């Protein structure tokens, strides 16, 4: 599994590290991903997901079923 949020699809961003003399070197800005066990009340079980911290905040607001439906994810396959 890659470094990608399973609900939002967030992934790394290609960027430049710019020095004081303005030399630019490529760098990767990784998404802030965390492994999170989320309770799925409809199935009465835990689901382990790799989520960005922004997705964790949204998950607390919307709930797992609504967020997964919105993202088009089948939680039975996770």
Curated annotation (Swiss-Prot):
GO cellular component terms attached to this protein's record: ribonucleoprotein complex; ribosome
GO terms of biological process kind: translation
Coiled coil: none
Keywords, alphabetical: Ribonucleoprotein, Ribosomal protein
Taxonomic superkingdom: Bacteria
One GO molecular-function entry: structural constituent of ribosome
Xref: PANTHER family: 39S RIBOSOMAL PROTEIN L28, MITOCHONDRIAL, LARGE RIBOSOMAL SUBUNIT PROTEIN BL28M
Family from the record: Belongs to the bacterial ribosomal protein bL28 family.
The protein's name: Large ribosomal subunit protein bL28
Organism, scientific name: Acaryochloris marina (strain MBIC 11017)
């Amino acid at each position: 599994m890659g470094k990608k949020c399973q609900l939002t699809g967030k992934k790394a961003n290609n960027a430049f590290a710019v020095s004081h003399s303005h030399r630019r070197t490529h760098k990767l800005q990784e998404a802030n991903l965390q492994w999170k066990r989320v309770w799925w009340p409809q199935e009465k079980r835990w689901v382990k997901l790799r989520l960005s911290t922004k997705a964790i905040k949204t998950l607390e607001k919307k709930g797992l079923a609504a967020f997964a439906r919105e993202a088009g994810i089948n939680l039975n396959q996770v």
